[in-house]
Each structure stands twice: as structure tokens, then as C-alpha cells.
Regions:
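Extracytoplasmic catalytic/substrate-binding loops of multi-pass membrane glycan-assembly enzymes
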Residues: 26-41, 48-60
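Start-transfer (signal-anchor) and selected internal transmembrane alpha helices
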Residues: 1-23, 99-104
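Aromatic- and kink-enriched transmembrane "portal" helix at the membrane-lumen/periplasm boundary
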Residues: 55, 106-133
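Short linear interaction motifs
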Residues: 38-43, 72, 115-116
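Transmembrane-helix motifs of polytopic, lipid-linked glycan transferases
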Residues: 78-100, 136-140
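Short hydrophobic/aromatic helix or loop-helix immediately within or flanking a transmembrane segment
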Residues: 48-82
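Transmembrane-helix signature of polytopic, membrane-embedded enzymes
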Residues: 92-114
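Specific aromatic-rich, kink-prone transmembrane helix
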Residues: 129-144
Length: 145
């Protein structure tokens, strides 16, 4: 019985990550229509007033919006969904590699790591996901080597 449960862990992780992505996309879509969402303004920092650090993503969102004739809020929503989804699938690939380490599994499933953006709506959709994406990418590369 124990062996069968261990073989199913990757599928459990995948279902868990897919649920998080589904709920995350739903929350992001709901938040992007609200007029007073402060996370949108963080993504809008750009280079139109001169060189500003942290302005690259905002400039890319504006250019993306102009090129494809999207509303700016919609292009930022697409960026948020893209980075959010990539982040969680990288976490899934890491989870597949650390099945045996129970301490890592416990820390990953703690509410402060994976569930935090969904549990705390005000923190959801912020640009910090890019930093987390870089960290998770680093771990993913190190685990595969």
C-alpha cells in the first residue's frame, strides 16, 4: 500500500497545482476588473518618464498592449497569468523531484509558500512573483543537474 501511494504523489501534486492555477486565474480575472486594485499600478511602472528601475515589465506591457491593440489592463492580466502559471508549474517540476524528502514537502505545502498568494488576496498579482520565479528556476536547474 505504501508503494502505491508513493507512486501517485506526482499526480496528486499535479492536481493540486492545477487547482491552484485555476483558482489563481479566476481571482486574477476578478481583480483586474476592479478599479482600485493596487497591484495593477505596480505593473505599470515604465520608461516613459525616463529611465526608472523596475520599469522594464511596465514598458513591455505597454508595448504589448499597443502592438496587439489590447486594453492595458488586459495585457497586464495576461502577463500576470503567464508568470503565475509558469511559477506554479516550475514548483510542480521541483515537487516531482523531492518526493522522498518529507520536510521539504511539509514546508512547500505550508500556507506561507504555495497558498500564500491565493490566501492573501492583496499580495496576489504583484511583481514579486518574478523574484519567486527566478528562485524556483534556480532550484529547478540545480535539482536537474
Amino acid at each position: 500500500m505504501q508503494n502505491k501511494t508513493n507512486n501517485n504523489w506526482p499526480s496528486y501534486y499535479l492536481y493540486y497545482i492545477l487547482m491552484l492555477v485555476f483558482f489563481g486565474v479566476f481571482i486574477l480575472y476578478y481583480k483586474h476588473d476592479v478599479g482600485n486594485d493596487s497591484t495593477i499600478s505596480d505593473w505599470l511602472i515604465n520608461y516613459s518618464g525616463g529611465f526608472v528601475r523596475r520599469g522594464l515589465i511596465g514598458q513591455l506591457a505597454i508595448e504589448f498592449s499597443n502592438f496587439f491593440s489590447f486594453k492595458l489592463r488586459d495585457s497586464i492580466l495576461m502577463f500576470q497569468i503567464f508568470f503565475f502559471t509558469i511559477y506554479y508549474f516550475f514548483v510542480f517540476f521541483i515537487l516531482r523531484k523531492v518526493i522522498e524528502n518529507r520536510l521539504i514537502i511539509l514546508s512547500i505545502f505550508s500556507p506561507i509558500f504555495i497558498l500564500y498568494p491565493i490566501a492573501e488576496i492583496e499580495a496576489f498579482g504583484r511583481k514579486e512573483i518574478l523574484i519567486f520565479l527566478i528562485i524556483v528556476s534556480y532550484f529547478l536547474v540545480n535539482i536537474q543537474n
